[in-house]
Amino acid sequence: MDAGKTTLSEGLLYVSGSLRKPGRVDHGNAFLDNYALERQRGITIFAKQARFSSPSADFTLLDTPGHVDFSTEMERTLQVLDYAVLLISGTDGVQSHTRTLWRLLKRYEVPTFLFINKMDLAGTDRAALLAQLRQVLGEGFVDFDAEDCEESIAMCGEEAMEEYLQNGSVKDTTIAALIKSRALFPCFFGSALKQIGRSVV
């Protein structure tokens, strides 16, 4: 799947200061794709580990293969994740392999954020993509950039709804609990290559 997973990972390492310059898969100089065969084919074959920090926390990033041929390597990694970021191409939408990944994330009960990539390209439709996610994968997908974000979050749980009705907002701790329990899946839209929306993730 050419959704831009490694490009996003390189970008996260770059903005955190862990890389001086982000590599590019198409240029064959991606930091995370460091095996010759990976650079030759332009895909991730082996899971890689990298560390980066934000002002509030330290993170260990695991960049996993996205191609269907290397699903075993990816599934092995899922079993140790605290959280996952699932990348979807804005030009392709939900594919059959996306559904497979989603079933695995559900099986291993991994709280999941979504980054819908390549939104800078022609033909992408944010509303249509969000509707497709809900139709194909289920409920709980919320566009965290939308004006009605709080209302949509409130629909994901009783406690969240009570807080929203009383205060017009939902507490961060409640949102975190919804994400942890896989009742809420925050969605972010952008372009990893052009650094649009990437810093939010």
PLM feature segments, named:
Residues 1-3, 21-22, 90-201:
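P-loop NTPase catalytic nucleotide-binding module
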Residues 1-80, 84-88, 94, 109, ...:
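P-loop NTPase switch module centered on the Walker A-proximal segment
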